[in-house]
Swiss-Prot record:
GN (gene name): fabZ
Family: Belongs to the thioester dehydratase family. FabZ subfamily.
The organism's place on the tree of life at top rank: Bacteria
Reported function: Involved in unsaturated fatty acids biosynthesis. Catalyzes the dehydration of short chain beta-hydroxyacyl-ACPs and long chain saturated and unsaturated beta-hydroxyacyl-ACPs.
Compartment(s) where it occurs, according to its Swiss-Prot or TrEMBL record: Cytoplasm
Name of the featured protein: 3-hydroxyacyl-[acyl-carrier-protein] dehydratase FabZ
Enzyme Commission code: 4.2.1.59
Catalytic activity of the protein: a (3R)-hydroxyacyl-[ACP] = a (2E)-enoyl-[ACP] + H2O
UniProt keyword list: Cytoplasm, Lipid A biosynthesis, Lipid biosynthesis, Lipid metabolism, Lyase
InterPro entries linked: FabA_FabZ (IPR013114), FabZ (IPR010084), HotDog_dom_sf (IPR029069)
Catalytic-site annotation from UniProt: H46
Single annotated GO MF: (3R)-hydroxyacyl-[acyl-carrier-protein] dehydratase activity
GO cellular component entries: cytoplasm; membrane
Lineage: Bacteria, Bacillati, Bacillota, Bacilli, Lactobacillales
GO-annotated biological processes: fatty acid biosynthetic process; lipid A biosynthetic process
Length: 139
């Protein structure tokens, strides 16, 4: 999926759109990338002399990745997905300008409109962040 297809699936726009490309997608698994550049607005304040991507934005990028997976399904194309929670979140590596986040999300449980995914973000094959994310699919 290119950026136009991602924008067709997600309601997010600059500066909050944190998925640049989807590399692979199946019924319950997705791999996407975020190219992190010094031009990201959050680097102005986090931190001016030592730019590091905020962990919460890494988790948001993972949530958006899972959102693309859910919203690309035919039955969900006109719906919104709401981030309902996260558990077991771990940050293992700082993400800095020039890094490419490779993000994966795999659905592990569904019940009605609620879905749970295992998500990971890696840089150069090393784990940067991971967690279990919960979503609610709205109307």
């Amino acid at each position: 999926m290119d950026i136009r297809e991602i924008q067709a699936a997600l309601p997010h726009r600059y500066p909050m759109l944190l998925v640049d490309r989807v590399l692979e997608v199946s019924d319950d698994h997705i791999v996407a990338i975020k190219n992190v550049t010094i031009n990201e607005p959050f680097f102005n304040g986090h931190f001016p002399h030592y730019p590091v991507m905020p962990g919460v934005l890494i988790m948001e990028a993972l949530a958006q990745t899972a959102g693309v997976l859910e919203l690309s399904k035919e039955e969900n194309k006109s719906k919104l997905v709401f981030y309902a929670g996260m558990d077991k979140v771990k940050f293992k590596k700082q993400v800095v300008p020039g890094d490419q986040l490779v993000m994966t999300a795999t659905f592990i449980k569904r019940r009605g409109t609620i879905a749970v995914v295992e998500a990971r973000a890696e840089v150069d094959g090393k784990l940067a962040a991971s967690g279990t994310l919960t979503f609610a699919c709205g109307q």
